[in-house]
Amino acid sequence: MEPEFPLEFLVSGTPISQQASSQSRTAWKNVIRAASTHALPEGHWLTEEPISITIFYFPAEPMAGDIDNIIKPILDSLTAHIYFDDRQVERLLVQRFEPEGIFSFDDPSPKLSEAIAGNKPSLYIRLSTDPFEELR
C-alpha cells in the first residue's frame, strides 16, 4: 500500500548535524523513522512519485548552528523508507522558528498546530507528491 500524501508528522528532539558522529546520525535517523511510522500505513510501499518536503524546526532556544547542516540526516532517514531515492526530491523548504518569534500561520494543519503549541525542540515534516502545490 502506497502512503497517502500529503504526509505530516512530528519529531521530538534537537536535529543533529551532518558533521555529527556516524553513531549519532544513525540514532537520529532511527528517531525520525520511528516518528514517521504513525503517519504511514503498515507495510507501506515506497513511492516512486516526485517529492516535495517541508521541514520546520522549532528549537527550545535560539539555534547555535546553521540550518543547512540538519537537512542531510533528515533526508537520509526518509530515503528507502518513504521514497526510493533522494533524486525524487524536487522541492525542499527548510525553516527555523526561534522561540521568541513564532510566525502566525494563516491556516495551519492540525499537525502543524500541534508542532507550534507543543514541546520544543521539535521538527514538523511534511511530504507531498506535488512539488508545485504552493506555486498554484
Locate predicted features.
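Acidic, proline/glycine-enriched N-terminal capping motif
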Residues: 1-136
